[in-house]
């Protein structure tokens, strides 16, 4: 299999991960690249719109094509940079540079052409791709009406030219066969891993360093970094291996106050950033260490808390502060003040720019993931419950309460079910006491614990 081993270094410690073959989708704006990306992926992942230039970040996903795993990359609309175009916005230049880098790192390049019309830009792009001709597959999109357009593009001498309809799925099977050709050996056919990976999301307000952190972890530019807030639109994913764990990491769009989300495309990006919380185990919540926690931070964290996910607070841009033990202690107190009920959450000072603290953060991730997968025997739970009730019985203000037995019902997230004679008579502060004892006594000190109380039904 093509691909490479990448080594990451932090404070003298090294870890590596295997990179799957990368198939990069390129083409001028609005030819249907994102629609084709979504078609090959089998679900909507890239934002599609009639507006030219919607895709900014190079969106990567692991996909199984005909039994073989690879990384599929959707790039922004591609135009060849020239001095005449030098007046374009800085952000657009960054987008182009990212596309160029994706092409240089590709194992195969999928050039998407518009079957309804040719353009002078197509010829510019084709000439730019000449040095990569051996990796190139040309897909003529929007050919619902037939294959006569095949002959218009045949003059360029593509070794592989396929007419497809990304919208309707026409000829996608043939395209998949062309993509995997010569990328794999037969014994590399496999299914995507499901339960042996840690799913992470990098979440926070705009311009706090989420994309810089993602790029540091991937050791290449997968997310655009710019001083302008709101640069990331899609959810960008990448793979890292640390210790014995495999991570799938998602860099989300910065979540702003609702009244500040103007564009429909940005609105969709924010909705996707929030919805990704339903598909991850742990959230790296990143804030600018120079700032305090705002009301918006509290609202975002409440969305995370509702899902009982593992959380790590990353105090980013620590390199810009006069770091000291007392300052770290103060910042941690600020976190406890802002999120009192989440006093179990680890707080790690980091610099996504220099890599300071990143290894510590990843060690925290491993610890939290192990705790999220903890299974406690029912006998051990009820022995502990008896000790807790003996040391601190339930209040009798609203009548006698008897706690019958405790069982664990799930992992990732951790949830316990407590049976009692009068669940409605157990005050909230006693529920918190039980949750804290579960965390402290059962080795779950860094994760949220959901405790549901149900009425015990007597057998007759």
Curated annotation (Swiss-Prot):
Domain KH-like: 374-457
SUPFAM superfamilies, A to Z: P-loop containing nucleoside triphosphate hydrolases
Residues reported to bind GTP 1: 27-34, 74-78, 141-144
MF-aspect GO terms: GTP binding
Domain EngA-type G: 21-187, 198-373
Entries under InterPro entries matching the protein: G_ENGA, GTP-bd, GTPase_Der, KH_dom-like, KH_dom-like_a/b, P-loop_NTPase, Small_GTP-bd
A single GO BP: ribosome biogenesis
Residues noted as binding GTP 2 in the record, renumbered to the chain: 204-211, 251-255, 316-319
HAMAP family associated with the record: GTPase_Der
Designated name of the protein: GTPase Der
Protein source organism: Treponema pallidum (strain Nichols)
Gene: der
């Amino acid at each position: 299999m093509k691909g490479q081993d990448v080594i990451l270094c932090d404070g003298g410690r090294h870890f590596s991960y295997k990179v799957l073959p990368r198939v990069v989708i390129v083409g001028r704006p609005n030819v249907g690249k994102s629609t084709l990306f979504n078609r090959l992926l089998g679900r909507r992942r890239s934002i599609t719109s009639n507006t030219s230039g919607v895709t900014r970040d190079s969106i990567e996903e692991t996909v199984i094509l005909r039994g073989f795993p690879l990384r599929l990359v959707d790039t922004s609309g591609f135009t060849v940079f020239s001095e005449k175009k030098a007046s374009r916005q800085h952000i657009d230049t960054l987008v182009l540079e990212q596309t160029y880098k994706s092409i240089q790192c590709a194992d195969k390049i999928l050039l998407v052409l518009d079957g309804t019309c040719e353009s002078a830009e197509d010829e510019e792009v084709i000439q730019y791709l000449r040095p990569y001709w051996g990796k190139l597959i040309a897909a003529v999109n929007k050919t619902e009406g037939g294959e006569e357009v095949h002959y218009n593009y045949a003059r360029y001498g593509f070794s592989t030219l396929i007419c497809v309809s990304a919208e309707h799925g026409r000829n996608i099977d043939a395209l998949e066969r062309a993509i995997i050709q010569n990328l794999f050996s037969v014994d590399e056919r496999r299914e995507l891993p499901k339960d042996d990976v840690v799913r992470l999301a990098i979440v926070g307000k705009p311009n706090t360093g989420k994309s810089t952190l993602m790029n540091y972890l991937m050791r290449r530019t997968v997310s655009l970094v710019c001083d302008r807030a709101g640069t990331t639109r899609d959810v960008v994913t990448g793979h890292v291996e640390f210790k014995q764990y495999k991570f799938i990491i998602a860099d989300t769009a910065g979540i702003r106050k609702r009244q500040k989300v103007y564009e429909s495309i940005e609105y969709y990006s924010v909705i996707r950033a929030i919805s990704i919380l339903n598909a991850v185990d742990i959230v790296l919540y990143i804030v600018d260490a120079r700032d305090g926690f705002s009301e918006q931070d509290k609202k975002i964290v409440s969305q995370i808390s509702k899902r009982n996910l593992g959380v790590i607070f990353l105090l980013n841009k620590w390199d810009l502060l006069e770091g000291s033990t007392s300052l770290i202690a103060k910042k941690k107190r600020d976190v406890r003040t802002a999120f009192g009920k989440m006093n179990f959450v680890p707080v790690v000072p980091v610099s996504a720019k220099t890599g300071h603290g990143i290894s510590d953060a990843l060690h925290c991730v491993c610890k939290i993931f192990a705790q999220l997968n903890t299974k406690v025997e029912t006998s051990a739970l009820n022995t502990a419950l008896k000790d807790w009730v003996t040391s601190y019985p339930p209040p009798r203000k609203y009548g006698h309460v008897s706690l019958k037995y405790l069982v664990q019902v799930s992992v990732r997230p951790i949830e316990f079910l407590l049976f009692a004679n009068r669940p409605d008579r157990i005050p909230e502060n006693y529920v918190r006491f039980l949750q804290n004892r579960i965390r402290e006594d059962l080795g779950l000190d860094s994760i949220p614990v959901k405790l549901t109380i149900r009425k015990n039904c007597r057998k007759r």
